[in-house]
């Protein structure tokens, strides 16, 4: 019976420890690659996309991604947290109905070149909502203060 020995399988100037070191770095690189975020943030190039990305991600329960599409200030973040809390306060069936609902955009009103108002509803609750979408250096983002404030 033939026995295999590491010294017969490897060239004279390469040690088993060197190969194990290479394997260790390969596995480390693969691990770090897998840990990197796989979801890419898609910048909203227009107000319709900004509003739609926010609404879709909110309805799907993906609040981490939906948060990327709001104007980040203290009041907006507080309103956003309330929206997420209300969503997770629903039972499993209620959340599923929202996830399956479709978005119906009723009207888009361009106030000026940097502000647009989107009037929409979803097929689940059929309640009309308005979003103010603002052009920012990081794309078009939703200002929740308009939706939940006295400006309506």
Label for each model-derived stretch:
Residues 43, 48-49, 53, 58-111:
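Short solvent-exposed beta->alpha transition segments
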Residues 100-152:
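Exposed beta-sheet edge and beta->alpha loop/turn motif
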